[in-house]
């Protein structure tokens, strides 16, 4: 069989209460917002979806297996660092061909932050930014994202077997 594998990653996080003082982080970018997302790490849904897509493409366990929310070492962890670690776990036997990701929320709009998100994700994966796509969409006011209760993200990662492996 060929040397390509694809993985799908999905993540969702609810907004935290403003009194918790959490910052909103998407793709490693701190985005001005009254509310951040609730989570054990920095709750970066975009980075988490990409991480799960990468791990899935390599046929490995999910993000929670490697970075469990029961482990205090990962409390408030930088999710771009988690992605970088997941890339290390996947190892050199696979090359990232591309990643396509979408953030699903009514607010905030991510357009002005997309390029920096792409750069952050690409750097963590060890590829040029042209191999990473980040888009935003709404759920047309349907479901928990439509009601402004949280943010979701989905990502697809294509891996190719590295030459000589």
Curated annotation (Swiss-Prot):
It comes from the Bacteria. Keywords: Isoprene biosynthesis, Lyase, Metal-binding. Its EC number is 4.6.1.12. One of its GO terms (biological process) is terpenoid biosynthetic process. InterPro entries: MECDP_synthase, MECDP_synthase_CS, MECDP_synthase_sf. Its cofactor is a divalent metal cation. GO terms for molecular function: 2-C-methyl-D-erythritol 2,4-cyclodiphosphate synthase activity; metal ion binding. The record marks 40, 138 as: Transition state stabilizer. Pathway: Isoprenoid biosynthesis; isopentenyl diphosphate biosynthesis via DXP pathway; isopentenyl diphosphate from 1-deoxy-D-xylulose 5-phosphate: step 4/6. Pfam families: YgbB (PF02542). Binds 1 divalent metal cation per subunit. It catalyses: 4-CDP-2-C-methyl-D-erythritol 2-phosphate = 2-C-methyl-D-erythritol 2,4-cyclic diphosphate + CMP. CDD domains: MECDP_synthase. The keyword Kinase does not apply. Homotrimer. NCBIfam families: ispF (TIGR00151). HAMAP family: IspF. Belongs to the IspF family. Involved in the biosynthesis of isopentenyl diphosphate (IPP) and dimethylallyl diphosphate (DMAPP), two major building blocks of isoprenoid compounds. Catalyzes the conversion of 4-diphosphocytidyl-2-C-methyl-D-erythritol 2-phosphate (CDP-ME2P) to 2-C-methyl-D-erythritol 2,4-cyclodiphosphate (ME-CPP) with a corresponding release of cytidine 5-monophosphate (CMP). This is 2-C-methyl-D-erythritol 2,4-cyclodiphosphate synthase. It comes from Rubrobacter xylanophilus (strain DSM 9941 / JCM 11954 / NBRC 16129 / PRD-1).
